[in-house]
Amino acid sequence: MKLVTFIHQDKERIGAVDNLGRIVDLHRAYASHLQKVESTSAGDRLAEIVLGRDMVEFLKRGNEALAAARNALDHIASYDVNGGGVFDRGQVRLKSPVPRPGALISAGKNFSDHVAEMASKKGPTAPVAFLKLPGTVIGPEDDIPHPSEVKNLDYEVELAIVIEPGR
């Protein structure tokens, strides 16, 4: 499942990409699922409780939130949802999937192709690691803030691994 954090109408939302490549607002889709399938009128409130308010809360909720997200996506695939919450990619602005993560420990110079592109042309003899401040994480469409004196910016590949509790 591809999880996303996105902005729609100036509001940050958590979502997932459906099998058609659309962005699904998980809160709205799960609330619709609860109202239609579970026959509850408290779908909006229950969706927030089960899924969390943001991606960090969603991830902390673990399997229960993941099951709810799957139900939301199945619901979208099975029903004609008129309440909205399903967007074409161009209708939303993607943010970093986890906009406010905890500690980030990064490995530097870990791809030989990237090392070869760098001026030193020599890989490290020992592992290189560094910390990132959580506020430095941005989305794929965001500008990279930097001082005007900076003439060259380097890129890096990002990979997130979310490990399920008990694994």
Segments from the language model and where they lie:
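N-terminal non-catalytic cap/leader segment that marks the start of a structured domain
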Residues: 1-125
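Glycine-enriched loop-and-adjacent helix/strand subsegments that border the catalytic/binding cleft
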Residues: 93-167
